[in-house]
Amino acid sequence: MKVRMYNVGFGDCFCLRDRKKSLLVDFGTNNSRIEGRPRREIFDVIISDLSTINRKNLLLTHFHMDHLSGLLYMMKNRDSSLDFGKIYLPDVFSKEEMSRTLVLLLLADLLKESGLPSRQVSLFALVDALLENRQNLELLSRGKIFEDKYQALWPDTDVIQRETDEVYNEICKNENLAAVMEELLNFAEKLRRIIWSMTEEGKAQTEKEQEKISLAYVYDREFRRIKAIPEFKELLSFLNTNKVNLRQFKHKISIVFQNARDGELNLLFTGDVQPGHLKMIAENYDGKLPLYEHYWCIKVPHHGTQEHYFDFSQYEPENMMISNGIHFANSKKESKELRTSPLYGGLFYIPDTHMYCSNCDCCDCYENGCSCKEADVISPAYYKDI
C-alpha cells in the first residue's frame, strides 16, 4: 500500500495504490500554471500515470474546481484506458429534498467571491460532463463502507439538510425571490435525477423516468434562461449584499473517510471539511464512528489554511500531507488567508511526524528553510510516494 501525492499546486490529487485496486482521491487545481508549467501538462502527466493502472476508481470529495478540474479535462479528452470502474460522490442526490442543497451549490459559484469565471459553475460542469460520458456512480454518507476497506465519516445527510433548510428558508422569506428560487429548485431536481440515474439504485428507475433525462445542451440552455431572468440578478445582489456565504456549502458536503477497520496503515482523508464538522467527527458526535488512536497518514483539510486548521497531535500521525500551492486571489487579504497555517510547523510541529507539502513558497512556517524537522517538499517534481 502506498499513497502517491501529486503536485497540483493549490489543488488536490492523491492515489491510494495497492496491488488489487487503486483509488484516486480528487483531481484538480485552481492554478493555470504549476511550477511554471501549464496545468494541462500536469494533468497529462497524471493521466499518463493513471493509464498504467488497470483497476481504478475515483472519489470526489466535493465540487470545487481545485478538486475536479482535472477530471473534467480528462473526460473532455476521453480515452477508454482512463475509464474508472466507479466514481464516488458525496450524497446530496439520493432524496428529492436534497435539491435545495444543490440550489445553494449552484448559486455559490455565481457570487462575486466565488473565484470562478461567471460561466463556470462546477456542479453544473460535472453533471454536463457526466451526461456526455456516463459513469457508474456511488453516493457516500456517514457510515457507508466502500472499496471493501474504507468508511465515510462525512457528510451526515441529516445535518446537511438541517443546515441547508436554515439558509434556504431565510432566502425564501424575501417574497420577490420566491419565484426564481422555485425555478432553480426545479432545475436542481433535474440535475439530481441525472446523478441518481447513474447509481445502482437509480438504474432501477422505470424506463419512463430514464426517458425524462435530456441531452446536455438542453440543460445548458435552460440554465442560461434562468440566469437571464431579472429576478435572478436581484437574487445574486441580495446574496452579495447580505454576505450569505454559500461557498462554504461545498465544504459542508465534503467527504471525510478512514479505514473501515483499525490497523497499522490507518488513513484519514479530510477533503475540505468545515472545522466545525471535523470537530463533531473527532468528538464522535453520534457515538457510532470514533476516530482511531493512531494514523499512518492524514490528509490535512483545505490545503492547510489557517481557517481550516485542526490539531491532529493526539492521533500521533506518522505522515501528514498538505496539498498547498500559491493561490493568486483577487486581494492580498484573501491570498494571505489561503497560505499554509504556521500552526502546522515551527514550534507547533508534531514530533516524529513526517510532513509532505506540495510547495514551500506559500507556507508561513518557511523562512530560511523548512521549520519541520522531518519534511519533503514535492516541488518541482510531479509527485511523491509515501
Set out the residue ranges of the language-model regions.
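Conserved beta-strand hairpin/beta-sheet module of binuclear metal-dependent hydrolase folds
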Residues: 1-53, 249-279
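C-terminal regulatory/interaction regions
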Residues: 1, 9-10, 262-263, 273-292, ...
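Active-site environment of divalent metal-dependent phosphoester hydrolases
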Residues: 10-12, 31-33, 63-69, 94-97, ...
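Active-site metal-binding motif and surrounding structural segment of the metallo-beta-lactamase
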Residues: 34-89, 287-307, 318
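Long, well-ordered mid-to-C-terminal structural blocks that present hydrophobic/aromatic surfaces
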Residues: 34, 243-244, 257-300, 306-311
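Short, aromatic/basic amphipathic alpha-helical patches
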Residues: 42-43, 100-110, 123-130, 283-285, ...
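Hydrophobic/aromatic beta-strand patches that form the interior of the parallel beta-sheet core
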Residues: 4-6, 23, 59, 88, ...
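Flexible, acidic/histidine-containing loops and adjacent segments that form or flank the divalent-metal
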Residues: 77-266, 353-386
